[in-house]
Amino acid sequence: MGKPTGFLEYERKDGPVTVPKERIKNFKEFHGQLPEEEQRLQGARCMECGVPFCQAGTMIAGMASGCPLHNLVPEVNDLVWHGNWEQAYVRLSKTHCFPEFTSRVCPALCEAACTCGLHAKPVSTKENERAVIEYAYANGLVKGEEPKVRTGKKVAVIGSGPAGLSAAWNLNKRGHSVTVYERHDRVGGLLRYGIPNMKLDKSIIDRRIEVMKAAGIKFICNADVGKDISGKELEKEYDRVILCGGASHPRDIHVPGRDAKGIWFAVDFLGTVTKQLLDTNFEKVPYELAKGKNVLVIGGGDTGNDCVGTSIRLGAASVTQLEMMPKAPECRAASNPWPEWPKVLKTDYGQEEAIDVFGHDPRLYQTTVTEFKKKKDGTVCSAVLVSLEPKKDEKTGRLSMVPIEGTQKEIPVDLVLIAAGFLGSEGYVAESFGVKLNARTNVETVNGSYRTGKEKILTAGDMHRGQSLVVWAIAEGREAAKEVDKSLMGYTYE
């Protein structure tokens, strides 16, 4: 390492962030970058630690510790420190095809496993990664070049989310001819319509897609495979098909009044907002969806937080966010040691904005809804909430959250956004290809591989593993591409 004592000499410094009262005025990204020289010093903070857990991607207690892509984090950080941005990009590209996405939306599993984070703040690897890829784009290093030799093999990728794009990029590099099918009007899947623009500017996706097109990858939009096009057709036309349709089936809540008007699945709400912004070049903001309304967000995860931030930008009168689980501790518990993922309280951008705008945290912990009430016209007007407590099942030993009698309360509600996670993939896609779904409604695979029961059909991403992170989807797309390559050519490059 070029600066073994860098972690002692330099404090962590993050890029500038626009204050909540300013950033809620628009849907623009609000995380800036440090000047180049200051970013270099952040690379210098990477220690010469004996075991770099940051790049391990090891599963501990059911959660990933370190990067699932196995990015060579210490090497990239060292090259950043030396100001060798071109080689930093080359090194990062060996494992990662889309750093511009993860450097914006990843929870930074690498930083959670950083050795420096044991006694100080971890190395800002996520921001270093963003600096590297933005330098690469600005200096013409990211090129869409067609492979010199084509194999003559054709592969269809169903879905253009992070897993599908990753699979397509890696297969194309090996010389296979790749066509990506997307059911929506624009490429990007979850990246396009599941993540708000202020978190991932859609021009970032467009920039990458242009590179992929220049490299010879074809994209067909408004093509809902399983409905518009049959799986059998594609099986005949292509040598291999990879199903990367995501876990797009949202989990519902079944309570009285669920049929009231004004109750949305979060993914539909976020997608509607983004589509209208894109269709009008950000000139028309769909304020009518939430302006002046009391918004109830059900779910305390990332999507729920995105709903909070989006509702505030649309002029909501109030926002309440329900979280079934107890409030996480401020610091790690003894039962959650490093390098496990830290189960600690996180206040994300949406909650920060709610605190700034409304003067309080929008989250109600250990709370769920038991009923929605309607006006005469069928529109939702209130929600009945109840407090929960953990209770252990004596037979199984499992803890579950159960209602506490006498804790019901009613709050006014005009808009409900259900962000309770996803159950799995849409069944009609798998059915069209004649492949099975498992008990979790993910596509069933052979011996934990990416292969289904049919030789030509593989799967990757959330459609394979269930709802997960963008970084996992990219990793799965890459590994599934290797499996396809090996099945077609008899070998692949590791």
Describe every region a protein language model picked out:
Residues G304-C307, L314, A460-Y491:
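A conserved FAD-binding loop/helix module that cradles the flavin
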Residues Q87, V149, K154-I158, D206-V255, ...:
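Feature captures the FAD/FMN-dependent oxidoreductase FAD-binding
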Residues T5-G32, L41-A44, G57, P68-H82, ...:
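Beta1-alpha1 glycine-rich phosphate/pyrophosphate-binding loop at the start
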Residues I158-P162, G299-G301, D462:
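Glycine-rich Rossmann-fold phosphate-binding loop(s) that bind the pyrophosphate
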Residues P4, H31-A61, W85-L109:
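Immediate flanking context of iron-sulfur cluster ligation sites
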Residues D259-G292, K391-Q467:
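FAD-site-proximal beta/loop scaffold in flavoenzymes
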